Design a protein with these regions (language model features):
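Hydrophobic targeting segments
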Residues: 16-22, 41, 46-51
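Active-site acidic Asp-centered loop
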Residues: 53, 110-111
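Short, well-formed alpha-helical segments that are part of the catalytic scaffolds
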Residues: 27-44
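Active-site-proximal specificity loops/subdomain of glycosyltransferases
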Residues: 12, 18-21, 25, 58-109
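Non-catalytic membrane-proximal stalk/linker segments that position and tether the catalytic domains
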Residues: 1-13
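Catalytic-site signature of metal-activated, phosphate-bearing donor transferases
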Residues: 8, 87-94, 115-281
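Short beta-strand/loop segment that forms part of the nucleotide-sugar
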Residues: 46-54, 76-80
């Protein structure tokens, strides 16, 4: 039986189509390494719809440059009209799902403070293919937050960023959540998902804001205040993180071996800068 499953699964390989969706708004001024995040997502998708919600800080101009450089990137401009930040993400995602992602088999959502590790590309695609063949609708993945690599006492929860495309899926009410129309929302952390049946994945997804716990370039406190208002405990953890620095005895900042190479050039910067060499990759 297992051999038949494997043969059937492999017959689907290279046939599935995957669309990426990425909602952004003023991420340049928010100090998000969004260029690196987008680039590391491209190997997983056939197309990546990056939506700008009406940025006024130069984010859109950079996205337009990326669209010209990487054919997989398609920039959309769905304005963020609602007052609550999570509602604006939901509104943009809902529009992308309804209008841009038609015809693709699976969807991957990535945000400007997240990344998939390059060493997990093959495993991620294989897991999507297996989930597709076995009839699952989503991968519920662990995500690590707050303390990052150097501190292993991380706060973790499991949410969904990879799911089978369906006209019944909605992203509404609670912050980049995905659920089938008519089903209740099962909340975990401050994000809700409900796309049964779900596959319990072990492929870790990471927060960029936790990438360099020894680096002032990524201001974790700002992230908490902007995206986790009313979550005082989480905000306190981020404040603690911001005050913590890990340095080698020589004074040089250590780059943890698990940090993908594309992010190495950011370590030690006081402010996030879009590096021109990335457009030459």
């Amino acid at each position: 039986m297992e051999a038949e499953i494997q043969r059937g699964w492999k017959s689907h390989m290279n046939k599935l189509t995957i669309a990426g969706v990425c909602p952004l708004y003023n991420v340049l001024s928010a100090q998000y390494p969004f260029v690196e995040s987008i680039i590391t997502t491209l190997p997983l998708v056939d197309v990546l719809f990056v939506n700008d919600g009406g940025s006024t800080d130069g984010t859109l101009e950079i996205l337009k440059r990326m669209e010209k450089r990487w054919p997989k990137i398609i920039v959309t401009e769905i304005p963020h009209r609602k007052s609550q930040f999570w509602e604006t993400i939901d509104e943009a995602l809902e529009s992308l799902l309804r209008n841009e992602c038609i015809g693709y088999d699976w969807i991957i959502e990535i945000q400007a403070d997240e990344y998939f590790h390059p060493r997990l590309y093959e495993a991620t695609l294989a897991e999507i293919e297996m989930a597709h063949f076995m009839g699952y609708n989503a991968l519920r993945q662990p995500i690590t937050t707050i303390f990052g690599w150097e501190r292993q006492d991380t706060y973790t929860y499991r949410n969904i960023r990879i799911f089978r495309n369906s006209p019944m899926i909605r992203s509404m009410w609670g912050g980049d959540c995905f659920h089938f129309e008519g089903l209740p929302q099962n909340r975990e952390g401050f994000t809700s998902h409900n796309l049964p049946p779900e596959y319990d994945s072990n492929i870790l997804r990471h927060h960029l804001k936790d990438l360099f716990v020894n680096d002032r370039m990524l201001q974790a406190k700002n992230h908490a205040e902007f995206f986790a208002t009313k979550h005082e405990q989480r905000k306190g953890y981020f404040n603690k993180l911001q005050a913590t620095q890990y340095q080698h005895r020589t004074g040089n900042i250590i780059i943890h071996p698990e940090v993908p190479e594309i992010f190495h050039g950011l370590v030690g910067l006081e402010k996030y800068e879009v590096r021109e060499e990335l457009f030459e990759l």
